[in-house]
């Protein structure tokens, strides 16, 4: 299977302002944006996102109903993009606080998710609720807890949400054996 890389229509070099053109740097590699004036290579890097699967002291999961697209009205665990220079684990804790109003302790890495042709790389952690009152910010319509048998599988926003929740549940069952 050949992966297709999409080059966004950037026209000018961020280093010198010269014109960018598409060029292959090495045989077999996809075309890159290269400045004709200074030679700067404009790499379209992936965007790093984090997610936090939060459980309370009774093992219920915290999910947020999205108030923004994509996935408006669908359920996700708290998450979002990592800011440049921010530690990934601190971003996961920050997103839990911002999107669900909760302070958490990260317990372990659930998995890392990426998909061909998509920019985000999603790093998902399992976490335990420590304190706070469940509350949504402007990106959420509702926040609530779900028992494992109540997860709204048909109303989850993203493939990564479904896969991470399944991986989390499978990991809990394996650990319990």
Segments (PLM) and residue ranges:
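Conserved Nudix-box catalytic region and its N-terminal flanking loop in Nudix hydrolases
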Residues: 2-3, 56-98
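Active-site-adjacent beta-strand/loop module that shapes the phosphate/pyrophosphate-binding cleft
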Residues: 113-134, 144, 164, 169-172
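A short coil-to-beta-strand element that immediately follows conserved catalytic motifs
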Residues: 22-24, 103-110
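NUDIX/MutT-family hydrolases
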Residues: 136-165
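Conserved hydrophobic/aromatic beta-strand scaffold that supports enzyme active sites
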Residues: 12, 32, 53, 63, ...
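Acidic/histidine-enriched, glycine/proline-rich intrinsically disordered or flexible terminal extensions
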Residues: 2-4, 157-177
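Cys/His-rich short segments
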Residues: 2-47
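N-terminal strand-loop-strand
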Residues: 29-76, 104, 108
């Amino acid at each position: 299977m050949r992966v297709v890389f999409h080059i966004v229509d950037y026209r000018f070099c961020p280093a010198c302002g010269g014109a960018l053109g598409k060029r292959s740097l090495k045989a077999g590699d996809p075309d890159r944006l290269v400045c004709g004036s200074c030679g700067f290579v404009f790499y379209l890097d992936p965007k790093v996102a984090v997610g936090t699967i939060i459980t309370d002291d009774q093992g219920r999961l915290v999910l947020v109903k999205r108030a923004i697209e994509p996935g408006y009205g669908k359920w996700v665990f708290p998450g979002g993009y990592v800011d440049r220079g921010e530690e990934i684990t601190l971003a996961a804790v920050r997103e839990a606080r911002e999107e669900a109003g909760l302070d958490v302790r990260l317990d372990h890495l659930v998995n890392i998710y990426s998909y061909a042709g998509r920019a985000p790389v999603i790093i998902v952690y399992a976490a335990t609720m420590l304190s706070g009152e469940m509350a949504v910010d402007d990106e959420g319509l509702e926040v609530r807890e779900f028992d494992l048998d109540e997860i709204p599988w048909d109303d989850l926003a993203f493939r990564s949400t479904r896969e991470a929740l399944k991986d989390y549940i499978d990991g809990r069952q394996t650990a319990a054996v």
